[in-house]
């Protein structure tokens, strides 16, 4: 959903669009709630309130103020991520395909021959980090840039087994045009760029678990963040390899050597960060022209000092000369050294060339060892070739993708490696490594151990659900970690599957009820975005690879109606009820009937079940941005801080009734996951509320009326407003509650329109308009620790006779209350009051 705010209506009609006119009779929160439950994707919001827009954005729903038709058209034609704190719109708009254009934010790609392999007549455009260079295309009242690129396709091609780039690109563009937009993945870079500066500013010690290549630039500005990944491939792991020969396989049609060099250097930087927690100077020998340096500098400020006879235009300092072993003394401490020296083959035959390469490999290693043997805080990444060689058993081997699989690979060495044991590795083993292993991640830090760390803030995005982790250990970590942002895969299956397939692995699945948390928010991706200054124009799909975002130790926990709130809680219900259901009242009718309340007159205004909890359960796949457990808990302890809107405090029994309705809904739909979720939420309600039942009551509250429009043969027809189980010394407390509620009780608009047999030999009249007052009275008694109400549904009725009679219908008749009293069952009246 996206909300586009306008001061004036527009003549143009757009598909999947509704118009909402601000209702001045309601406050900003109520207007926001009504907007959030509209069913169209595009909402044109007229006569808007800025506060309402802010409320929607904090809820994760993109709401943007537009000042011109051009702005409206730009936003209505595509999806986007909105930085509402800085008023920046990041479009995810691929309409540039209509210009026969693909886009990249990787500068090095523009310096390759990729254009020879594009679709006929197509071009490549560099758009800068997150499309920053496109800002000039949009002369808008808000900052706007198109973050859409085709880098995901290019990178997927590089790591694939396919060689024909044009066919690969064509297939992927067609897939993009025929499948739903993966909005979470596209907006994730924007999210990370907001998230980590925020966390790093507030917490000195930050742990990040499971970063992948898409985050390779995000963390360049955060050397103190401790990374955990899947670990490095080290020399001693090669013992498992069988010897092979040179393969000579082409990986990419266009030259990706610069990409390989960039990955090597970035891998080395992060390895350095994990050791020394600061930014190094970056020395590079060879690898000119290194256009990729421009990319790195767009994200973070580094000093690059380079040696190569060929120009390196983006280096900070370039020495247009060769580097020799004696020059090592020029290199300072607190640095990384990338050695990529390789003489051009020119016209040498392969045997002579092989000798030169092996000599250079030995020379490169000597430079590396000399560099690491003196000074402090140093890491080296060195180019090697497959040959009989001794290497430290702890050296980290790299084989990032390059244009052709030939003989080269790289090793990362630190100051400890050069003093450790070395092992002789034959050439064939290195070929086996090169032929079969591709380094897929620039983060090669050791794996994370699933243990809470009280002094750290842990971030684990899409990293812990894999089934090689113990599911219970993941739950324990989340329960015990005081400060964290951790995601786990949501169980949105229908058969309550404990794990589901994802690519070539399996993920554990989770529901919010799997965790026992306080001061934590459990929400969706868009709900989480709202907490960090972002909002989204497109929610996650209800099925597929979706995640719960669990934020521990957030200062937004008590801001119940601002973050992870009830916005959109009824949207799916509206979509169903106003399109394919038997009646738009279907939800109300089902909730009453499933709790054995057969009086459906006015069911849409006087329902016996919490619609919030019911919708949050049966449609949780659509609206899990709403943190139901937090909502229940804060109500149970009386700490609900509400800024605005129509606030109705539910009685705990209403929540129980909702769970029962949801359970029956799940059984009818054969939805085993909702069935378990409803059962567990009911258990949670009973845990946090101290609910007691007057199933063996000794007192009741009765209401008598001045006018009963039916014949009756009981002595005094009355409405039982509830039963109690109390000791005699609690009578004064009950009376005090009744006196406090007196005005509201007598203002209750009770009406009747038919009579019926409640049980055999119990003839009663219906009583409408009672439930709202009953639940308020229930809450009053609950807060005063007085047992009121039974475990079964309260059905308001007036007993007329203890004999069997036929149903009679009349025009709805208002009943005038005569008196309200407290009486002992089979005893005397102990309190009576009249208006």
Swiss-Prot record:
**UniProt family annotation:** Belongs to the rotavirus VP3 family.
Write the protein's name: Protein VP3
Q: Where in the cell is it found?
A: Virion
Region labeled GTase/RTPase activity — which residues? 556-692
Please state the span of the N-terminal signal peptide per the UniProt entry.
none
Active site per database record: 718 (for 2'-5'-phosphodiesterase activity), 720 (for 2'-5'-phosphodiesterase activity), 797 (for 2'-5'-phosphodiesterase activity), 799 (for 2'-5'-phosphodiesterase activity)
Keyword field contains Methyltransferase: yes
Catalytic activity, per the record? a 5'-end diphospho-ribonucleoside in mRNA + GTP + H(+) = a 5'-end (5'-triphosphoguanosine)-ribonucleoside in mRNA + diphosphate; a 5'-end (5'-triphosphoguanosine)-ribonucleoside in mRNA + S-adenosyl-L-methionine = a 5'-end (N(7)-methyl 5'-triphosphoguanosine)-ribonucleoside in mRNA + S-adenosyl-L-homocysteine; 5'-triphosphoadenylyl-(2'->5')-adenylyl-(2'->5')-adenosine + 2 H2O = 2 AMP + ATP + 2 H(+)
Transmembrane segments annotated in the record for this chain: none
Question: Which PROSITE patterns does the record match to this protein?
Answer: SAM_MT56_VP3
- Which species? Rotavirus A (strain RVA/Human/Japan/KU/1995/G1P1A[8]) (RV-A)
